[in-house]
From Swiss-Prot:
Pfam families: DUF520. Nucleotide-binding protein. It comes from the Bacteria. Gene3D superfamilies: 3.30.70.860, YajQ-like, domain 2 (3.30.70.990). The keyword Nucleotide-binding applies. The keyword Nucleotide-binding applies. This is Nucleotide-binding protein Mpe_A3039. Keywords: Nucleotide-binding. Belongs to the YajQ family. GO terms for cellular component: cytosol. One of its GO terms (molecular function) is nucleotide binding.
Amino acid sequence: MPSFDTVLEPNLVEVRNAVDQSSKEIGTRFDFKGSSARVELKDKDITLYADSDFQLSQVMDILTLKLTKRSVDARFLDSSAKIEKIGGDKVKQVLKVKEGIDSETAKKIQQLIKASKMKVQAAIQGDAVRVTGAKRDDLQAAMALIRKDVADVPLSFNNFRD
């Protein structure tokens, strides 16, 4: 039976490259001279440091631009963390790199496929959703449906089997 997996996986090598490029640009930009603005990557956490909220937003813009240039969707970053004050006027923000579909989104995909009355089944498997069907055309229609209705996360499809 043909099947595919719906996953949420960023290219971590490109994320690291974007962070490195952002660090270089921050180091050479005139408006950041003498400031403690920087970007660090540890595991799947990107930490932004700056002297003020305004500079932090500039650092975030630089990082987003570099991610976009490296073909990494900025929606992979979970920027819901609040800005923390660290000594004096300095601030930091920790961004998590999303990897794996959370259970809420997986259930949404599963219910979407069931409600569409297509001849495919969706099964949640850890941090991925496997969609199986009798025909390849049904699977392609399911992919189009998922892309159209689940736009808040950058989903990708892999492991397509015939």
